[in-house]
């Protein structure tokens, strides 16, 4: 079914369903892939920058970290105004590791295009690779047309499919390391020699001392992953957390922006994670009967 609420193995326990504002979300056990809670998880939604998880997957599978990519005119100038960028310069040479850091931490759209063109020769060819990979890992309702999630009506996914991508990406040590960082300094280059470019994470769940928000969205068990926002997609996130012997993935799509801007997604993730950690252990997840 499209919307199925998980319940605890312990029948004597009254499991309260997590309260989420998001119209489409899912909670998955990272190790087994078991779905612990879902709401409209197979409904097609715009993924915004959570798309970049797939871009990172293909980068990690097709490149060496010390490989150098050169930014084209298209990579620099095809990003619409107001979308996040790493101020990459035309002709600038950056390593794959540097590009992955700015792709995943501040969500740089220009970095996504540099990577796509480096790997596949064009955005279109890279999108085909993205779609093939999505099918390979089990996605059922996903179609990509670009590497960054800039809005396009033919660019969509689902909470379930994005959870699969998150689960797949978290198998890479480099991905796990990068998405857990709260900031990154991109060193000066020949094309940008002013100073280091400093970037902060877009993920409120891992910002321990985040004073610019009226509420603290930090979650002590959060381990990272990827946010997204466009006017059409609203607020999105694929988030990961680990407590004791359980690692979880939460996906929240098209979330409200009424509570302190973008961070309603953080509150929804907290609710999902708390539900999972309070009602499941590794043993109950493994033994849970598939419905």
Describe each PLM feature range:
Residues 1-2, 290:
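Intrinsically disordered, low-complexity polar segments enriched in Ser/Thr/Pro and acidic
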Residues 2-160, 164-173, 178:
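Active-site-adjacent loops and short helices of periplasmic peptidoglycan-processing enzymes
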Residues 139-140, 154-156, 160-291:
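Domain-terminus/edge residues, biased toward the C-terminal soluble/receptor-binding domains
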